[in-house]
Amino acid sequence: MASLDWYFDFVSPYSYICLHRLDEVPGSIVYKPVLFAGLLNHWGQTGPAEIPAKRQWTYRWCTWWAGELGIAFRFPAAHPFNPLHHLRLSIACGNRAEAVRRIFDSIWQGGEDAGDAQRFATLCRELGISEKMLSSQEVKDELRRNTEQAAARGVFGVPSFFVDGEVFWGADAIGFLKAFLADPATLRNEEMRRLASLPVAAVRKS
């Protein structure tokens, strides 16, 4: 059975939707929380919520898609929000699957304020994590390492899977991932090799 690293950020609605589809993936999942903003900075990208028209589309699409999949879903009271404390909470919990799911659900199911300090403190108590544990250097270092590792592996967005040297980005890439796991030649055929070295014919002026 394959072991897959799953990179996610709690700020991402796509990560939440993907979480609820992980049982479709044949393999052992290693949960790797990362700071999406750090990946955006690394690659010089703009987040989808930073472009007004794209922001509205993303919110509408995710709401509709989650409904189609039968996933309980409601955007928090304000978005984007700062996910740093939630990411550290996941790490302090050892990134256990049930803890990751509980954190995601607390953000994406009730339409509440994800940045509310009292709600977050209640969540920490529920998961048995103290403020001191959240602010430990070990927790901070692991989040930084995860984000740096993701960037070094070519991860540019969340959610992303990494397996056998390949990145599969997006909650909608699970079918592609499953095809690769069933037959690695999916990414090793002649056309895929051609795409890897496809020349650039024009570059947009900055």
Predicted features and spans:
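Structural alpha/beta surface segment adjacent to cysteine/selenocysteine redox centers
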Residues: F10, Y14-I107, E191-S206
